[in-house]
């Protein structure tokens, strides 16, 4: 006979997000209001000015698999507790080395402490929610939302310098990732001419690669060579149609309409 147990009133959730050259994972328990007050002077849940575990039950944990920066401070790859001190206008966001929960909290174990403004929560109001949003190559925002309140803090990383060194080393080896290097130099490496050279070499061994022609077209437009870009986008369209790629067909047609 299968034995069932009562589900937790604050079910646990773990979110994992690729970020930069690593990952961010957050594990926390999600309390619901259930008619109770929160973020007030004498509220039942998370009263103003009091240290909060930022969730329920055990410590809310955040793990970075790669070094990041929060509040201009380097945070080494590791697992930390997230504590907060809610306020009416601002919150204190705290990352702490101890992962044993709020009862074991010591201020001297704080790794970083930042102040962030309170915003209006337009998402889930009943159940406490943590999201990772606004994801860019080197930055993202971690959002905490409950009731009518939302706060967020930025997480930053540095990938450009490491990618530059990596691609320079790979291009000097026997295995040369020309297309990947071209994409890097165009998107992040701030070297359109080197990007154009690398994608041109890549196309020599794969002339039907519509995605390579598409990248080449965008690089040529950025450089200002519209004549070459027109030729490249036509090749993108032809190769995309031949390969059955409707997405790249639409992308090519959109550029053709603008050139």
Q: What are the language-model segments listed below?
A:
Residues 1, 182, 258-259:
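Short, solvent-exposed mixed-charge patches
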Residues 2-59:
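Start-of-domain marker
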Residues 40-53, 95-106, 174-175:
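Short, solvent-exposed cationic patches
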Residues 57-171:
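Long, contiguous interaction/recruitment modules in multidomain scaffold/adaptor proteins
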Residues 164-220, 224-228, 238-239:
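Alpha-helical adaptor scaffolds
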Residues 218-223, 244-259:
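TPR/TPR-like alpha-solenoid helical repeat scaffolds
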């Amino acid at each position: 006979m299968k034995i069932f147990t009562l589900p937790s009133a604050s079910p646990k959730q773990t979110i994992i997000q690729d970020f930069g050259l690593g990952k961010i994972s957050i594990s926390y328990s999600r309390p619901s209001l259930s008619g109770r007050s929160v973020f007030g002077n004498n509220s039942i849940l998370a009263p103003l000015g009091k240290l909060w575990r930022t969730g329920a039950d055990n410590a809310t944990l955040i793990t970075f698999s790669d070094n990041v920066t929060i509040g201009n401070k380097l945070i080494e790859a590791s697992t930390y507790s997230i504590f907060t001190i809610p306020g009416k206008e601002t919150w204190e966001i705290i990352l702490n080395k101890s992962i044993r929960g709020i009862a074991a909290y010591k201020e001297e174990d704080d790794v970083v402490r930042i102040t962030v403004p309170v915003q209006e929560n337009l998402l889930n109001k009943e159940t406490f929610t943590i999201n990772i949003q606004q994801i860019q190559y080197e930055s993202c925002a971690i959002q905490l939302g409950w009731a009518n309140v939302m706060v967020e803090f930025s997480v930053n990383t540095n990938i450009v310098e490491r990618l530059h060194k990596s691609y320079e080393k790979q291009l000097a080896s026997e295995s040369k990732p020309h297309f990947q290097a071209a994409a890097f130099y165009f998107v992040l490496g701030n070297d359109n001419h080197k990007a154009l050279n690398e994608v041109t070499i890549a196309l020599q061994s794969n002339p039907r690669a519509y995605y390579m022609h598409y990248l080449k077209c965008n690089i040529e437009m950025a450089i200002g060579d519209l004549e070459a870009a027109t030729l490249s986008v036509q090749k993108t369209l032809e190769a995309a149609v031949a390969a059955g790629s409707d997405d790249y067909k639409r992308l090519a047609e959109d550029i053709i309409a603008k050139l």
